[in-house]
């Protein structure tokens, strides 16, 4: 089996050295070249034809976002962004995911070398996932058509969504067409702490429904989506006639919900960037219906209107 060929673009010589050490320490991948800026990277991409690019956000001559936008338009390839763990860094990273980056790695704020080496296994796994990603499914999505508003649904109705790699854009595509009469949505998206608040704020500006990072003890309301804070779990508890969020994901939970009577949806392979969580849920028997991403919003509201609880 051939190794995954990686090219790293970063203006820091130390970061290029660290990324080379990390990539070359795994037997299934190799660093074929490094570049100090996007203009050098452009020539190296032509020369080495890498499978995956790791790309810093802030660089001289051309920043990472400008380069990513041009790259995805002219020569699409799997990209893993390398970003600082700051408010500004999270905003830029979310924009990179919109432009077509598969995933991202956050730089530690202190002890760069020790911190990055501690992330070695995580970085390698992100590179492996990126190498297998479907670029066709990760093309920028056009704004979905707003769905027709129906009567306000009962606070008893809920939709739960779980997402991992490639999920940020899929979630946007699902939430954006939902009318204010939609039931409450509870969302778990695999992200580090700090990024989920920026993600929620970004969606809140784009969607008709309210979108926010969930808070412990918060009452769940129709017409709102609640995103679990990074690295935390989210549960529901009864509070009188209402539901209340408890901040504390995946295929096993989905199977349990189906067994309890929920109607469960999974995104199909053709529209997934990485067909990981949906495949596991389908294989475990936790899925009632498999649909294309473009049909998820409409199917959710149709099932809810018919009186069924939904988990996707």
Curated annotation (Swiss-Prot):
Enzyme nomenclature, EC number: 3.1.1.61, 3.5.1.44
Keyword Hydrolase appears in the UniProt entry: yes
PROSITE patterns in the record: CHEB, RESPONSE_REGULATORY
Localization in the cell: Cytoplasm
Function (record text): Involved in chemotaxis. Part of a chemotaxis signal transduction system that modulates chemotaxis in response to various stimuli. Catalyzes the demethylation of specific methylglutamate residues introduced into the chemoreceptors (methyl-accepting chemotaxis proteins or MCP) by CheR. Also mediates the irreversible deamidation of specific glutamine residues to glutamic acid.
Catalytic residues in the record: 164, 190, 249
Domain notes: Contains a C-terminal catalytic domain, and an N-terminal region which modulates catalytic activity.
Protein name: Protein-glutamate methylesterase/protein-glutamine glutaminase
Domain CheB-type methylesterase: 152-307
Lineage of the organism: Bacteria, Pseudomonadati, Pseudomonadota, Gammaproteobacteria, Enterobacterales
Keyword ATP-binding attributed: no
Residues covered by the Response regulatory domain: 5-122
Description of post-translational modifications: Phosphorylated by CheA. Phosphorylation of the N-terminal regulatory domain activates the methylesterase activity.
Gene responsible for this protein: cheB
GO cellular component: cytoplasm
Keyword annotations of the record: Chemotaxis, Cytoplasm, Hydrolase, Phosphoprotein
